[in-house]
UniProtKB/Swiss-Prot annotation:
Keywords: Cytoplasm. InterPro entries: Caspase-like_dom_sf, Caspase-related_regulators, Pept_C14_caspase, Pept_C14_p10, Pept_C14A. Signal peptide: none annotated. The keyword Cytoplasm applies. It comes from Caenorhabditis elegans. GO terms for biological process: negative regulation of apoptotic process; negative regulation of apoptotic process involved in development; positive regulation of apoptotic process involved in development; proteolysis. Interacts with ced-3 (via large subunit p17); the interaction prevents ced-3 autoactivation. This is Non-catalytic caspase homolog csp-3. It comes from the Eukaryota. SMART domains: CASc. It is found in: Cytoplasm. GO terms for cellular component: cytoplasm. Disruption phenotype: Hatching is impaired in 5-6 percent of mutant embryos and about 2 percent of adults have uncoordinated movement. In the anterior pharynx of L4 larvae, several cells including muscle and neuronal cells that normally survive during development are missing. Slight increase in the number of cell corpses during embryonic development. In a ced-5 n1812 or ced-6 n2095 mutant background, where cell corpse engulfment is defective, the number of cell corpses during embryonic development and in L1 larvae is further increased.
Length: 139
């Protein structure tokens, strides 16, 4: 009856009436050695105190995060591989999306009665793209 139909819904509701303040963007006052932390885009004078925040989880709340017996967790294994393979030219949000895809498609935990999968998640309030740079690019 509902096969092939939309699998989810999004509701946009106002959660509060509180106004977010702002913070100074202090990158211009940071010594040159640490300038590599700046984004590729020019900075603004002020920013929301809630902006430029990223949180990543190995799984959704209430679900198990799996680990190989001899290696690290599935999420950390794939995050490491994705960063090593793609960090030079891919921004962080896309690296995390690729990590999520790999964990969901690649891994299964063999339980006695059923097979378990894992789905990482992250949320981002980035206002800019964040790229990793090699040491050669910094110095």
């Amino acid at each position: 009856m509902f096969f092939g139909k939309l699998g989810g819904f999004a509701f946009f509701l106002q959660r509060a009436v509180r106004c977010d303040g702002f913070i100074d963007n202090f990158f211009d006052r940071i010594p040159k050695f640490f300038q590599f932390m700046k984004s590729k885009f020019p900075s603004h004078q002020t920013s929301s105190s809630q902006a430029d925040l990223l949180v990543s989880f190995s799984t959704s709340p209430g679900f198990l995060s799996f680990k190989d017996e001899t290696k690290d967790t599935w999420y950390i294994q794939e995050l490491y591989r994705v960063i090593i393979e793609n960090a030079k030219d891919t921004h962080l949000a896309d690296l995390l999306t690729e990590t999520n895809r790999r964990v969901v498609e690649k891994y299964e935990a063999d339980k006695v009665v059923f097979v378990c999968k894992q789905a990482p998640e992250f949320w981002s309030r980035f206002t800019k793209q964040l790229f990793f740079m090699s040491r050669n690019d910094v110095f």
